[in-house]
Amino acid sequence: MNFRMKCLAQTVFGLFPWGEEINYWAQRNLSGTLPPSRKRYEQKLAQALAHQEAFRKYGFREQGVVYEIGCGWHLAMALVFHSFGYPDIKALDVNPHVRAELVNSILGYMKEDHRIPKEAPLIGPDGDVQKILRDAYGIDLMVPGDSRSTGMQTESIDYIYSQEVFEHIAPELIPVILAECYRVLKRDGVISLYICYSDHYFDVDKSITPLPLLQIHGDGLAEIQLSTALCEPATACGFSPVFPPGGV
């Protein structure tokens, strides 16, 4: 698919009040990205393990409260964190993406892998999604939610993680969101953010490169300072980065 077609489609979907449903239909019936494949589930599992490793390295607590920014359509990472043994997971997204059938697909993979018991409940057609997630999986679904003002208590969270979300956030909002993260995170807590700087349209159009700026500017672009936009506001909020600012 030409990336311009996807850009146009996403723009058109956003013009309608039911654009979210159209987008969901398109991902199920046109692009085939939903429901998530086993490969996609395994990618999410690997990503969750990477965040878990950061938590263990910089301050692990068995009963820590976890907060995810950008939980998406199927809650794969939140469910995986449940399987790690975390009893209380806050899953926030600005859009009410979550669909019961997509959550069930992840639960199915997890049962196949023996990460959760076979008798762990799925979400029925008329099931209360939020109640089942809370009661059975310890997931507090915060959708639609506002990461700038979560309503959570100060210093109530042990761990925060986010996977390929912050690159979609307007730069002027990042300091506000990070300030809220700092407020809710315990002073010895850990925040783990994975930022993907590659062009997300590369997945559907191989005629573009993962880093199109390099293709456009060629030898004239010696270095892109990728982490400055995040590290500077994070440090200003009070965070202590455990990696140096870098570039490519």
For each predicted feature, which ranges?
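Short alpha-helix
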Residues: I224-G247
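Conserved class I S-adenosyl-L-methionine
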Residues: E62-W73, V190-Q215
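A short beta-strand submotif of the Rossmann-like class I SAM-dependent methyltransferase core
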Residues: S162-V165
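S-adenosyl-L-methionine
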Residues: L107-D146
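Class I SAM-dependent methyltransferase Rossmann-like catalytic core
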Residues: Y24-E62
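A short glycine-rich, Lys/Arg-flanked "PGG" loop and its adjoining helix->strand segment in the class I
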Residues: P175-R187
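A short acidic, Gly/Pro-enriched loop at the edge of an enzyme's catalytic core
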Residues: S147-I160
